[in-house]
C-alpha cells in the first residue's frame, strides 16, 4: 500500500480501484464553511456540492480544454498507466475512476501536469489546485455507486437532464 500526506491523507492499496477528483485553482473561495466543518466522511460531498455552484474559474467548460483533458485521460489508458473506468469533465473539476497499473501519485502528477500544460497553452493561464481528493474502492457495490456518481454529476449540478447528454463524460458513449 502506498500512503502519503499532503493536506489530506492518501491511501492506495495495490490492486484497488481509485476514485480521484481534481479541481481548478481558485474554484472554491477560502474558506468554505460547509467544507471546513463537515465531518471527514462528508467533506468530499460538501466540497462537490459547493463546486457545482461556485463562482470561481470555469475554464473546463471551454470545449477545446475539455477535449484536451479527455485526450490526456485516454492517452494514459493507452500507455497502460491505468484502466479508465468512468470519467467526467465538469466546468471546474474532473472526476475519474481508474484501476492503476503504476504508482497513483505518478499517475496524478502525469495527468494533472500534462492536461495543465496543454490547457494552459490554450488559455494562457495556470490551472489545477495542488491537492487532489482520492478514495480507494472497497467493494463492487461501491464501484457501481462511484460510476453512477461520476456519470450523474452533470445532472446533479443541473447542467443536463440525463447523464448521456453531457458530452465530456463516459456516460455519453463517445470514445
Region annotations inferred by a language model:
Residues 1-175:
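Short catalytic/metal-binding and nucleic-acid-binding patches
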Amino acid at each position: 500500500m502506498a500512503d502519503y500526506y499532503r493536506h489530506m491523507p492518501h491511501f492506495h492499496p495495490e490492486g484497488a480501484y481509485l476514485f480521484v477528483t481534481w479541481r481548478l485553482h481558485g474554484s472554491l473561495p477560502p474558506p468554505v464553511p460547509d467544507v471546513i466543518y463537515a465531518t471527514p466522511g462528508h467533506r468530499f460531498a460538501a466540497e462537490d456540492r459547493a463546486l457545482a455552484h461556485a463562482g470561481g474559474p470555469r475554464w473546463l467548460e471551454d470545449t477545446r480544454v475539455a477535449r484536451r483533458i479527455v485526450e490526456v485521460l485516454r492517452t494514459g489508458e493507452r500507455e497502460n498507466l491505468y484502466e479508465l473506468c468512468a470519467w467526467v469533465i465538469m466546468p471546474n473539476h474532473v472526476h475519474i475512476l481508474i484501476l492503476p497499473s503504476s504508482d497513483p501519485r505518478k499517475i496524478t502528477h502525469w495527468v494533472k501536469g500534462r492536461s495543465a500544460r496543454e490547457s494552459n497553452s490554450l488559455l494562457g493561464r495556470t490551472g489545477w489546485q495542488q491537492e487532489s481528493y482520492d478514495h480507494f474502492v472497497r467493494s463492487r457495490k461501491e464501484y457501481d455507486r462511484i460510476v453512477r456518481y461520476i456519470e450523474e454529476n452533470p445532472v446533479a449540478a443541473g447542467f443536463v437532464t440525463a447523464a448521456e447528454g453531457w458530452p465530456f463524460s463516459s456516460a455519453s458513449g463517445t470514445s
